[in-house]
């Protein structure tokens, strides 16, 4: 997690597997490819939070996801974020969400085992399913496609500012490398985690 000054405000940068919650005048930033970020906020308590995660298996090929490192996979990433929001004074009944990411970035890697996976689509499906189940409304979304995204979550009016990473080859390559390492770590965790636990299925 990285802090940066931006327009005389602190910008907190989060990476894969991380989350951040604040009731201060801080902007939360992340860089997304196939990963997804959920921006949660309670406008009454004036608390915001964001996570950044990627699921480790293709649900069309496997019957379950495995419970592994907390914060890395969907249900845990969401539960950790929601619980952190509640600890800061948010109330579940007032939570609203905005979702971003899920681009077809990892599958664009040449000679990549992920060419056969719809990682971005899987993450989008999961987030929608989870939020619907938890009755947390999705106010807006910017998802899918083939471009990476940089997003900034502004606590003053709960806006999320987004720019696409379209033609910046070095940034895309770096993003692919980071998410590929993240996916490999998730896969290693799956193989070493022992007894499988169903955490989401249609």
From Swiss-Prot:
One of its GO terms (molecular function) is protein-glutamine glutaminase activity. Probably deamidates glutamine residues to glutamate on methyl-accepting chemotaxis receptors (MCPs), playing an important role in chemotaxis. PANTHER family: CHEMORECEPTOR GLUTAMINE DEAMIDASE CHED 1-RELATED, CHEMORECEPTOR GLUTAMINE DEAMIDASE CHED-RELATED. Its EC number is 3.5.1.44. The gene is cheD2. Keywords: Chemotaxis, Hydrolase. This is Probable chemoreceptor glutamine deamidase CheD 2. It comes from the Bacteria.
């Amino acid at each position: 997690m990285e802090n940066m000054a931006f327009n005389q405000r602190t910008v907190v940068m989060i990476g894969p597997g991380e989350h951040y919650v604040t009731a201060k005048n801080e902007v939360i930033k992340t860089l997304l490819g196939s990963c997804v970020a959920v921006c949660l906020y309670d406008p009454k308590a004036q608390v915001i939070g964001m996570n950044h995660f990627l699921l480790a298996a293709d649900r069309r090929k496997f019957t379950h996801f495995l419970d592994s490192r907390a914060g890395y996979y969907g249900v845990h990433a969401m539960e950790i974020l929601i619980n952190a929001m509640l600890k800061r004074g948010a109330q579940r009944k007032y939570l609203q969400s905005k979702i971003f990411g899920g681009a077809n970035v990892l599958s664009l890697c040449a000679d990549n085992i992920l060419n056969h996976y719809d990682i971005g689509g899987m993450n989008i499906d999961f987030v929608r399913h989870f939020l619907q189940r938890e009755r947390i409304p999705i106010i807006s979304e910017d998802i899918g496609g083939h471009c990476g995204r940089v997003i900034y979550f502004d606590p003053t009016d709960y806006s999320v500012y987004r720019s696409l990473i379209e033609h910046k080859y070095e940034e895309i390559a770096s993003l692919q490398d980071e998410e590929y390492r993240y996916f490999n770590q998730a896969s290693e965790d799956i193989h070493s985690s022992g007894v499988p636990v169903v955490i989401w299925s249609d």
